[in-house]
Amino acid sequence: MELSEIKRNIDTYNEKLEQLRGSLDLEAKETNIQEYEEMMTDPTFWDNQEKAQDVIDKNNALKSVVNAYRTLESELEDMDTTRALLLEEDDETMKQDLEQSVQDFKNELDQFELQLLLDGPYDANNAIMELHPGAGGTESQDWTNMLLRMYQRYCEQKGFNVEIADYLPGDEAGVKSVTLIVKGHNAYGYLKAEKGVHRLVRISPFDSSGRRHTSFASCDVIPQFNNTEIEIDINPDDITVDTFRASGAGGQHINKTESAIRITHHPTGIVVNNQNERSQIKNREAAMKTLKSKLYQLKIEEQEQEMAEIRGEQKEIGWGSQIRSYVFHPYAMVKDHRTNEETGKVDAVMDGDIGPFIEAFLRSQMDQHENEG
């Protein structure tokens, strides 16, 4: 790479950073950080633990953006300084290092832009993910279990913490339903891309004739809301609370007492199970939190539907649509039908390498919003 080309790249990156700076309002973010950190020094800060954690999470999110921008800004200055030195002194090792830095910087800038795409009102929240098999018994239940492992591996790679809140094993293999609580900054922002129906085509391990089978599983994802974010009043007369014995994922943590909780909300028909805690009280608290999140999400969707009707828009039912196909036979291919992102590395995808699909979806959403704007 010639120095003139390196300069063009640096100038392009500089221009991009300036554009981002204009939309980021860094000064306002830094002011907010100062305000949050002053709040954290207050002796009464931890009196309300949920509110305190909310402040800490918001502060960390702001610092993550500001620090990432400042780091990019500093790296770009260093690269330009090195380029200027190379104009005066021909040093091949220094030039190779600079070329590598320029290439690395592009990847860092792409990742930073991706981080900025997660600016929805609840993108920073934890996520509640539910997986359900389609028709087909053992075939689709096994496919649901494969998706469960895929998401567990992806979350592990992202540094997210995954709790299995509810797990109903399949009759012979796989899983009939599973609910995950995924905790981590931007968990919902990333995982919302997975909402929809996932299709598998393979030679069935359960078919002695070795025939090809197609299986389906649905993935639903909503944000987990904190009590500080929402106000949802639930009338005790509207719910029924039942207890049952926890089954446990893979037969683990099976309770001998009925500590698992099922809450049925009669006006909406929403049913929430929680069994990963050791006591009825904690399972009830967790189940109520999930129920409130679902009711609030329902409220948001109703408002969005009303606005869509006012604007005369036809809104597609998101989770009921097929979003991705995983073909194991007669060829190997995973393809996202929303973005046309595809790969032949099926094993890597099933081992959690779904980042490219999620990134492509987020970028397509950004492009769509820009076109609408």
Curated annotation (Swiss-Prot):
Record keyword Protein biosynthesis present: yes
UniProt protein name: Peptide chain release factor 2
Entry keywords, A to Z: Cytoplasm, Methylation, Protein biosynthesis
PANTHER family, per the entry: CLASS I PEPTIDE CHAIN RELEASE FACTOR (PTHR43116:SF3), PEPTIDE CHAIN RELEASE FACTOR 2 (PTHR43116)
Any Pfam family matching the protein: PCRF
GO biological process, one term: viral translational frameshifting
Subcellular location: Cytoplasm
Stated family: Belongs to the prokaryotic/mitochondrial release factor family.
GO cellular component: cytoplasm
Post-translational note: Methylated by PrmC. Methylation increases the termination efficiency of RF2.
Gene3D superfamilies (UniProt xref): 3.30.160.20, 3.30.70.1660, Release factor (1.20.58.410)
Database matches in HAMAP family: Rel_fac_2
Cytoplasm among keywords: yes
InterPro entries: PCRF, Pep_chain_release_fac_I, Pep_chain_release_fac_I_sf, PrfB
UniProt modified residues of type N5-methylglutamine: Q252
Function: Peptide chain release factor 2 directs the termination of translation in response to the peptide chain termination codons UGA and UAA.
GO molecular function, one term: translation release factor activity, codon specific
Note: The gene for this protein contains a UGA in-frame termination codon after Leu-24; a naturally occurring frameshift enables complete translation of RF-2. This provides a mechanism for the protein to regulate its own production.
